[in-house]
Swiss-Prot record:
One of its GO terms (molecular function) is structural constituent of ribosome. GO terms for biological process: translation. InterPro entries: Ribosomal_bL36, Ribosomal_bL36_sp. This is Large ribosomal subunit protein bL36. The lineage of its organism: Bacteria, Pseudomonadati, Campylobacterota, Epsilonproteobacteria, Nautiliales.
Length: 37
């Protein structure tokens, strides 16, 4: 899980979703998991 000020899709399979007001990226590749913080 990477915590960054701006989250971006790193590949085609990344999805940007919002959970409880937190922007997250979920992906089949665990290295691409991100959270805005």
């Amino acid at each position: 899980m990477k915590v960054r000020p701006s989250v971006k899709k790193m590949c085609e399979k990344c999805k940007i979703i919002k959970r409880k007001g937190v922007v997250r990226v979920i992906c089949v590749n665990p290295k691409h998991k991100q959270r805005q913080g």
